[in-house]
Amino acid sequence: MEKVIIIGAGPAGLTAAIELLKNGGDYDVTILEGSQAMGGISQTVRYNGNRMDIGGHRFFSKNQQVMDWWADLMPLQGKPAYDDKKLGHEKPLAENGPDPETEDNVMLVRDRVSRIYYNKHFFDYPISMKPETIKNMGFVTTMKAGFSYLWACVFKKPETNLENFYINRFGKVLYSMFFEGYTEKLWGRHPSEISADWGSQRVKGLSITALLKDMFKKVFGTKNKGEVETSLIEQFWYPKYGPGQLWETAAEKVKELGGKILTGCQVKKIMCEGRKVTSVVCDTAEGEKTFTGDIFISSMPVKDLILGMDGTKPCDTIIKIAEGLPYRDFVTVGLLVNKLNLKNETNKTTLGNIVPDCWIYVQDKGVKLGRIQIFNNWSPYMVEKPEDTVWIGLEYFCAEGDDFWNMSEEDCVKFATAELVKMGVISENEVLDSHREKVKKAYPAYFDTYKHFDTMIKFLDTFPNLYCVGRNGQHRYNNMDHSMLTAMETAEAIKTGKKSRKDIWNVNTEKEYHEEKSGN
């Protein structure tokens, strides 16, 4: 029986374990997780009766294997959720599916509403060509945006950076209004300094043309799931108690199948002999512990993996690339408030008539805040009193060790509250409770030595018993389903003896990957 060591109990690590162990898989699997939580950045934090989704995670994939995998762990609702029942909303229901009012292990169907908040006006996210958009932008700006887009269609810029990538798809005016400032908040760099790879992996086929096509297909009813850009979906699945609930369920599945999960095990060293990993050394509450194995699956940051290699040291070139790999860190501030000052002027009804958004993207350059999550709208079960209070998450992008990261929790909450008051989102005396969470290396970034990452991949592929999976494991800003697919490809390669890592690294690198794999 081959011994498999998996580093990290996030979506990729847990998926890899289940894929290896299911159907009587003859593997001795151990997952080493540095924290006490399951799901990595997809975990759910519980605080004073309310729950926080750290980054906001929609359960949607163009890959049917992933959708089936989720549904197998957490069946789709068969009866309406609390808010849908109260408000008379109709949702697709699974025959004989669980009732979320009486059962916990249930996947909800939720409406996707995400908008941009810019200059105290709401705009659709992604930008749409609705009369309301034109009204909020003003006639002159709308005309400028239209001519700017036509100019961009005729005079294409070389896509050598993210700025040109966006301008080619939206024109200079819309880029300046809705992409430039937010991107700089997210990465701490101007888009002209960032590789276009990020756009191709996160935005993919999204453009003004795609938005117009989507509107046309909506009118004439010709859309199917395989054709819809992820940024354009209108409904998604969501666990009753947030994404962490599904990954906690996945962890229990790993144990049922005979796998082991050890928490509080922070991998610090990767011991190598030649081009073979032999063991990993972890810091634990009881001191250092060593875990030997035949196969190693890593979802830890590539920088930490390379700099932690011992026994056989990587060459100077690889070490320099690893040292220069950039990351963006993340702080989220949860605020429990009596009400929001934002008016619900949509045709969507909500509990307490709050705005219906799951996410609000904050484009104003005068505040540091990047996004607002409204947890009531993700799932009413995330909030202890969903009709009387609003539980929001304020998302900030920063660098570990900078002034914002080092703020005390009290000062951070005051700062976040002041920004919301400045924007007119809340009144100062409305805050009832608060909580802060900090996440290191939340976003692998696409600048500095990232341009040499192909060299890193070639080096990592020289280790026949080492597989890199997931967002940080591949230094790729993947969605949750992409991270899972890297793990599924890895498990398949291990089970079949396939030596090439090409399919593992290629997940989410080409626009049509999911359509090709799922046959949509």
Where are these regions (language model features)?
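Mid-domain catalytic core of redox enzymes
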Residues: 23, 239, 265-410, 414-424, ...
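Active-site/ligand-binding neighborhood in enzyme catalytic cores
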Residues: 131-133, 137-273, 278, 292
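Conserved mid-domain beta->alpha element of the FAD-binding
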Residues: 156, 294, 298-305, 403-409, ...
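Dinucleotide-binding Rossmann-like beta1-alpha1 core, especially the glycine-rich loop
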Residues: 48-153, 204
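C-terminal lid/capping helical subdomain adjacent to the catalytic/cofactor pocket in oxidative enzymes
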Residues: 437-440, 447-520
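Glycine-rich FAD pyrophosphate-binding loop
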Residues: 21-47
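Conserved Rossmann-like nucleotide-cofactor binding loop
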Residues: 12, 37, 303
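N-terminal Rossmann-like FAD-binding beta1-loop-alpha1 element of flavoenzymes
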Residues: 2-31
